[in-house]
A protein has these predicted regions:
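Generic beta-sheet signal
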Residues: 3, 121-132
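Acidic, low-complexity terminal tails and accessory targeting/binding regions
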Residues: 1-3, 69-81, 139-179
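Phosphate-coordination/substrate-recognition cap region in phosphate-metabolizing enzymes
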Residues: 11-13, 28-87
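Glycine-rich phosphate-binding loop signature in dinucleotide/nucleotide-binding domains
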Residues: 36, 118-123
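Loop-to-helix element that buttresses phosphate recognition and phosphoryl-transfer chemistry
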Residues: 1-51, 99-111
Length: 179
């Protein structure tokens, strides 16, 4: 089985160091993605199912486990407006969660759980998700966790390929794609 993971473009607000709101969906490139999506089943976060469906030309399978990180009360706030010690912990401590939000470790656990339950009977499948979720899937494939998160650089608008033959393997990570 081949699991092709496409990382979504970054929301525009990130360029201004503002944490996206829950409704801040990344701008998907114009036009259809037929050449990328082919006929493989598409999975995505339940937070992006509608725009992904419009972009891909068909309805994806929405999974809560593939949604972007929940930043709780920090959604829509500029980093410079948040308490500096909390921002430092948010960056350095995988167990830190913003108020009413989710820790990095929680994202890693839910992505790893999804991967462990991913049906491997398909010849191909596609995941379209936030870069953090794609990184979490790669870490789960490698059998590592939060300690390796900062060492893995997978940017927006990239392709990552993992395969399954008795176990998950990373074939390609963070390759640039053209829409």
């Amino acid at each position: 089985m081949h699991l092709t993971c496409l990382s979504l473009p970054a929301p525009d607000c990130l360029r201004r160091a503002i944490i996206p709101t829950r409704d801040d969906l990344p701008p998907l490139p114009p036009g259809q993605a037929a050449h990328l999506c082919a006929t493989a089943p598409i999975a995505c976060g339940d937070d992006t199912a509608i725009p992904v469906a419009q972009w891909a030309g068909r309805m994806p399978i929405a999974h809560a486990a593939l949604r972007a990180r929940d930043h709780g009360a920090w959604h829509g706030r500029a980093l410079h407006d948040l308490p500096a010690p909390d921002v430092a912990r948010w960056i350095a401590d995988p167990d830190f969660a913003p108020p009413d939000g989710e820790s990095l470790r929680a994202v890693l656990v839910r992505a790893a759980d999804w991967l462990s339950r991913c049906p491997t009977g398909h010849a191909n499948m596609m995941v379209i998700a936030d870069t953090m979720v794609i990184r979490a899937l790669v870490l789960a494939t490698l059998g590592t966790g939060a300690e390796a998160f900062a060492a893995l650089d997978i940017g927006p608008c990239t392709r990552t390929l993992v395969t399954f033959h008795n176990r998950w393997r990373v074939r390609e990570a963070g390759a640039a794609i053209t829409f």
